[in-house]
């Protein structure tokens, strides 16, 4: 707020801001309502939102105003800046509302005024002083420099340092295009009477006054009459905006108070380029003084330096001579020369004449975003700040998208933080200018796997949509205050998890809308992901449509009202809510935009988590591995005794994570097994019916209710369960009933917020107890934990998944999957369709059944059930999966009901626990049998009533305990690890060609579980909903690029697929695999595989029956299954799996095709099949 000595007139009428220089994007401005958290010194002088908020102080010739800088989209944040509140207040006091009322109106369009001081540095530049009048003579080629004449001479000055003399930007109170929430942010730390005039973002050209009074910010629309008069109240109209501001600075006249102190603007804009000479970026090395080192990397180091010409602190990126070619180094510099955006780190110059090479950029004093998030104060960096940061990054990426650039390394570590939470995207070493739709990286290029899109990992191809994927991961980093993505998951497992449909869980406290955006960014098909323009608009909409502060206050207030865990939260003054009556607005109701400061609760500015939690049904991703977990959502429950662990929330969840506390000793499996067997009376039911007035059990994303059969049971508590649920991303719009629950109850729509510390503890279920004081029950054992991992798998502690045991014991968990809660994108409907039917009652029958003998390799364990004409033992040797016979999955033509794993009928409308076994038997497009990802532990020598044979991803056999075995001793019941053994060569293939099209109705003929399996009756079985229709085709919106799928042998073709042609295209159909058909890698050579591929290619080109082509194709699939693990390079392995997946899908289409085999030119199915075979051959020959 510089004091105005001279006065410059203003043209009549409302003056609109004139474009000047490079206009930035509005993306850098947040749109959330917030007030500065307590305890933080408000940097009142910094304006970090607006693009055209240059400090206006126009004085007559010979007079000089204060040297206070301004803010602009091209802000170069210096390590120093405006002082704190005192300086802003002192300068505000000196402001005179009459500063621009007098003086002649200038009609010369070339007459400009200086906004900032500028010191000449050679190259014919001219020194100017703020407030000095200048006449513009011309511009350089890119318009970033203006040639001007002043009383001191003629020369070049930066274009963004001057403005037309009649522009609104000369005024100290005019801030240009600023959103409503950004204005509130600017005024939040100021005093009563602080104000600014801004242009509306949503309605360009519409001006408003934002005025702070008594902790609130009021917004008044400035109206314009037909005769160009401006007014706030209809009784007081003025010719110019300056007159209006002057009037309301003396009398309120309808405003809540008078206009006293313009909000300050203190940062100078960035000077683009070294000089006005176009494309001159080479700097003199002697102009840079190197200071201390900031950090180092693979290619060089980064230092703090001073650009002596401008006395400007800069960042200097150096490169080692032997690590990077000069051309590659210049490519990065060339990319940075072309980008100019307030949220992109600006290139200032380069030194490339001799090594070591320098890239000189603006300096961001707070370092990279990742470290900043990990070390910041949660009281300062609140949910609003996090959302603001994400908005800025989306704005920068939208700019790159429009410029047709790809970044290729977007992550929190490559974003830098400046004053007042300004974030800028940096590190353009991998960025490229796109000349087509995609960019293919050279062989051997390295990429950050956890941030790289699947198509980029598989094919080395990049597009702006692969940056969108990385942006979704970056959002997850922001929401978790800098946690590492996919915590506890090894790099080699990430791609395999993604192809199974796994996506990271919803961070604790993350609003559903933000998580929906993350999931949209993680769509498998690039075409299905949103553009950065859409993501940026989505963030802006979030700010405008709702108050984040109010959501934080509402969510945390609800939790605090029911919990005694959060008494430490600081008692901040409560701000008035929107519903409170506005003061002094009776005579100005038509112009008041509305009360804008959201009411904040005592906890709103100190939320330990990044974003707020939702009380509505939201999508959660699977439970995470044990290596990294966060606090349990149930830590806020009143009954602290029943939680598996406690923790101090005072430091925020991430600080607790960094302490690396040791997890408690997990419960013994034997006792847990006995507990579940000996206490069959315990029932569990979790419902997903959420409402804004959720009960205490709902506070963490799910509710727990006792079984209807036993109403006296207290609600069970679940520490880790987001089970069958509905994903909220765009591709799940057609999904079945997710979080809203179903008529049948049961495991329906569980969401819950899983964090690394939560799952670091034992994942399990607390059973309902007849009395609340009975605390003797123990958590369920981790069914797939590291203690029973196969010794042959690396990173055991990171790869194992902690899964709750199935309390119904109606299914066998035969395979390690990502989580019980992970639902593949393409199969959400099917995941919601699965629920175990009512099972046999009592535990005694399980003890009375004779033990089943260990089955030989290649055989399958069939469930003990009544003979079914639809499924006979002779028909099904190839149908079983790892020892469980899976009946045809798909509704048949005659309306038969689908049978689930272990012969348990499934209801089409009910939601069920998507157990690992079910994932094997039902979800074909999301599981890769050849990928060693989180697979079930190897068990040996178990005294189970029945021993079933399972297979891991390598085709190795292992034995499984029955679900409810009778335990006689502790140690004997504990599963033991055995080293996997290679499977023998496959036996002759048996095919099922005919099969009846119906199967028994589960309501009329309940099926029995496998021998030795105890299946107590549960509420889920008793509350079956009516069967619903099964879709006859793939789910709408199925990704263009299906997840890579390792082939399945011909014997695994379900008879339902042959009986029903349309069923062949179902996404949710599961082709099961006979374990013994795995061909070991040492028996498949490259030559044999290529020979088999040539054989299939030859068969395709000849008129042969479809059945013969299918046989040959499945033979090739078997060869591929055995060969995939011998591919040395990871990227080639990814591409190979993708090609094999396409081949498998092509064979399925051929199998159900009614068209007779012909030549590839006439049959599109054959064309597709031939291209798949060729792609496999190409990958193998690389």
Swiss-Prot record:
The modification Phosphotyrosine is found at residues 116, 161, 174, 185, 218, 231, 261, 272, 299, 303, 439, 459, 568, 684, 719. It is found in: Cytoplasm, Cytoskeleton. A motif (Nuclear localization signal) lies at residues 659-661. Pfam families: F_actin_bind, PK_Tyr_Ser-Thr, SH2, SH3_1. Its EC number is 2.7.10.2. Residues 288-539 form the Protein kinase domain. It catalyses: L-tyrosyl-[protein] + ATP = O-phospho-L-tyrosyl-[protein] + ADP + H(+). Residues 827-851 have a biased composition (Basic and acidic residues). Residues 782-793, 809-825 have a biased composition (Polar residues). Residues 695-930, 1020-1182 are annotated as: F-actin-binding. GO terms for molecular function: ATP binding; magnesium ion binding; manganese ion binding; non-membrane spanning protein tyrosine kinase activity; protein tyrosine kinase activity. ATP binds at residues 294-302, 317, 362-368. Residues 107-167 form the SH3 domain. PROSITE patterns: PROTEIN_KINASE_ATP (PS00107), PROTEIN_KINASE_DOM (PS50011), PROTEIN_KINASE_TYR (PS00109), SH2 (PS50001), SH3 (PS50002). Non-receptor tyrosine-protein kinase that plays an ABL1-overlapping role in key processes linked to cell growth and survival such as cytoskeleton remodeling in response to extracellular stimuli, cell motility and adhesion, receptor endocytosis, autophagy, DNA damage response and apoptosis. Coordinates actin remodeling through tyrosine phosphorylation of proteins controlling cytoskeleton dynamics like MYH10 (involved in movement); CTTN (involved in signaling); or TUBA1 and TUBB (microtubule subunits). This is Tyrosine-protein kinase ABL2. The lineage of its organism: Eukaryota, Metazoa, Chordata, Craniata, Vertebrata.
């Amino acid at each position: 707020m510089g004091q105005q000595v001279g006065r410059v007139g203003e043209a009549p009428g409302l003056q609109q801001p004139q474009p000047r220089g490079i206009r930035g994007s509005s993306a850098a401005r947040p749109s959330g309502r917030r007030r500065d958290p307590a305890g933080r010194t408000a940097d009142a002088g910094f304006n970090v939102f607006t693009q055209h908020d240059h400090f206006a102080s126009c004085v007559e010739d010979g007079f000089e105003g204060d040297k206070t800088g301004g803010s602009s989209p091209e802000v170069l944040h210096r390590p120093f800046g405006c002082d704190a509140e005192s300086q802003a207040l002192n300068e505000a006091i000196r402001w005179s509302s009459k500063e621009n009322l007098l003086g002649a109106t200038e009609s010369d369009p070339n007459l400009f005024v200086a906004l900032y001081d500028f010191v000449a540095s050679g190259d014919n530049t001219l020194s100017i002083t703020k407030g000095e009048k200048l006449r513009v003579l011309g511009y350089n080629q890119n318009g970033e420099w203006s040639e001007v004449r002043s009383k001191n001479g003629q020369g070049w000055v930066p274009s963004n340092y001057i403005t037309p003399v009649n522009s609104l930007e000369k005024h100290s109170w005019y801030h240009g295009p600023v959103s409503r929430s950004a204005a509130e942010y600017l005024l939040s730390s100021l005093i009563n009477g602080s104000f600014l005039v801004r242009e509306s973002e949503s309605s360009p050209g519409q001006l408003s006054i934002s005025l702070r009074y008594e902790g609130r910010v009021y917004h008044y629309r400035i109206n314009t009459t037909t005769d160009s008069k401006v007014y706030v109240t209809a009784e007081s109209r003025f010719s110019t905006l300056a007159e209006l501001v002057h009037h309301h600075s003396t009398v309120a006249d309808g405003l809540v108070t008078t206009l006293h102190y313009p909000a300050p603007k203190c940062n100078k804009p960035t000077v683009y380029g070294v000089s006005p000479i176009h494309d001159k970026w080479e700097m003199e090395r002697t102009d840079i003084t190197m200071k201390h080192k900031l950090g180092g990397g693979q290619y060089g180091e980064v230092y703090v330096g001073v650009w002596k010409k401008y006395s400007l602190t800069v960042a200097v990126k150096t490169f080692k001579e032997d690590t990077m070619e000069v051309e590659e180094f210049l490519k990065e510099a060339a990319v940075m020369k072309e980008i100019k955006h307030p949220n992109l780190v600006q290139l200032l110059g380069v030194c490339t004449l001799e090594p070591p090479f320098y890239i000189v950029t603006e300096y961001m004093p707070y370092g990279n975003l990742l470290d900043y998030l990990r070390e910041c104060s949660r009281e300062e960096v609140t949910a609003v700040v996090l959302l603001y940061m994400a908005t800025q990054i989306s704005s920068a990426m939208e700019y790159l998208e429009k410029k047709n650039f790809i970044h290729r390394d977007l992550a929190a570590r490559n974003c830098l933080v400046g004053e007042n939470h300004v974030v800028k995207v940096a590190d353009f070493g991998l960025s490229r200018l796109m000349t087509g739709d995609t960019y293919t990286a050279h062989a051997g290029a390295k990429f950050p796997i956890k941030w790289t899109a699947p198509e980029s990992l598989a094919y080395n191809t990049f597009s702006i949509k692969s940056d969108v994927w990385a942006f979704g991961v970056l959002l997850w980093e922001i929401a978790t205050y800098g946690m590492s993505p996919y915590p506890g998951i090894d790099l080699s497992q990430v791609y395999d998890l993604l192809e199974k449909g796994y996506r990271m869980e919803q961070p604790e406290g993350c609003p559903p809308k933000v998580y929906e955006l993350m999931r949209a960014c993680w769509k498998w098909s690039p075409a299905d992901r949103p553009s950065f323009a859409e993501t940026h608009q989505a963030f802006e909409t979030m700010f405008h449509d709702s108050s984040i502060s109010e959501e934080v206050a509402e969510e945390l207030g609800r939790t605090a009202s029911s919990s005694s865990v959060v008494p430490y939260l600081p008692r901040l003054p409560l701000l008035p809510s929107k519903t409170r009556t506005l003061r002094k607005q009776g005579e100005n109701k038509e112009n008041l935009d509305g009360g804008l400061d959201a009411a904040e609760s005592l906890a709103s500015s100190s939320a330990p988590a990044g974003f707020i939690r939702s009380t509505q049904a939201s999508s959660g991703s699977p439970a995470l591995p044990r290596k990294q977990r966060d606090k349990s959502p149930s830590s806020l429950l009143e009954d602290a005794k029943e939680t598996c662990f406690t923790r101090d929330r005072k430091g925020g969840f991430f600080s607790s994570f960094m302490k690396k506390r040791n997890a408690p000793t997990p419960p013994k499996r034997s006792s847990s097994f006995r507990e579940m067997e000996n206490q069959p009376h315990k029932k569990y039911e979790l419902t997903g019916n959420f409402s804004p007035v959720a009960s205490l059990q709902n506070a963490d994303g799910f509710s727990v209710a006792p079984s209807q059969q036993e109403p006296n049971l207290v609600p069970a508590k679940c520490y880790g369960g987001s089970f069958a649920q509905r994903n909220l991303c765009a591709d799940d719009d057609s999904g079945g009933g997710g979080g809203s629950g179903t008529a049948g109850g049961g495991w329906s729509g569980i969401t819950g917020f899983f964090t690394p510390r939560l799952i670091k503890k034992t994942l399990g279920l607390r059973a309902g107890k007849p009395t609340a004081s009975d605390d003797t029950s123990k958590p369920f054992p981790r069914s797939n934990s590291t203690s029973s991992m196969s010794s042959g798998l690396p990173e055991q502690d990171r790869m194992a998944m902690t899964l709750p045991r199935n309390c119904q014991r109606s299914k066998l968990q035969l395979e390690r999957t990502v989580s019980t809660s992970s639902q593949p994108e393409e199969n959400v409907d099917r995941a919601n369709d699965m629920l175990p039917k009512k099972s046999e009652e009592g535990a005694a029958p399980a003890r009375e059944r004779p033990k089943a003998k260990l089955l030989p390799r290649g055989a399958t364990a069939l469930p003990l059930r009544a003979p079914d004409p639809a499924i006979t033992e002779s028909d099904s040797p190839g149908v079983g999966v790892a020892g469980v016979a899976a009946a045809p999955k798909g509704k048949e033509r005659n309306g038969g009901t689908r049978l689930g794993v272990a012969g348990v009928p499934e209801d089409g409308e009910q939601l069920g626990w998507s157990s690992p076994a079910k994932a094997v038997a039902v979800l074909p497009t999301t599981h890769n049998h050849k990928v060693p990802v989180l697979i079930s532990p190897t068990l040996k020598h178990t005294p189970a009533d029945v021993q079933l044979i399972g297979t891991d991803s390598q085709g190795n056999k292992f034995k499984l305990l029955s679900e409810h075995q009778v335990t006689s001793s502790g140690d004997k019941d504990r599963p033991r690890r055995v080293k996997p053994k290679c499977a023998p060569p496959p036996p002759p293939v048996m095919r099922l060609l005919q099969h009846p099209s119906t199967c028994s109705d589960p309501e009329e003929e309940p099926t029995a579980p496998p021998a030795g399996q105890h299946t107590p009756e549960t509420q889920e079985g008793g509350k079956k909903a009516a069967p619903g229709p099964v879709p006859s085709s793939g789910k709408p919106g199925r990704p263009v690029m299906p997840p890579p799928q390792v082939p399945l042998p011909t014997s695994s073709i379900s008879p339902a697929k042959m009986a029903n042609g349309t069923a062949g295209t179902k996404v949710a159909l599961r082709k099961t695999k006979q374990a013994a058909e795995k061909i070991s890698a040492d028996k498949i050579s490259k030559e044999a595989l290529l020979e088999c591929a040539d054989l299939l290619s030859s068969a395709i080109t000849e008129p042969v029956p479809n059945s013969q082509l299918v046989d040959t194709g499945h033979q090739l699939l078997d060869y591929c299954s055995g060969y995939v693990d011998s591919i040395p390079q990871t990227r080639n392995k990814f591409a190979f799996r993708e090609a094999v997946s396409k081949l498998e899908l092509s064979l399925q289409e051929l199998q159900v095709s009614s068209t007779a085999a012909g030549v590839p030119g006439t049959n599109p199915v054959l064309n597709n099949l031939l291209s798949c075979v060729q792609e496999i051959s190409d990958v193998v020959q690389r």
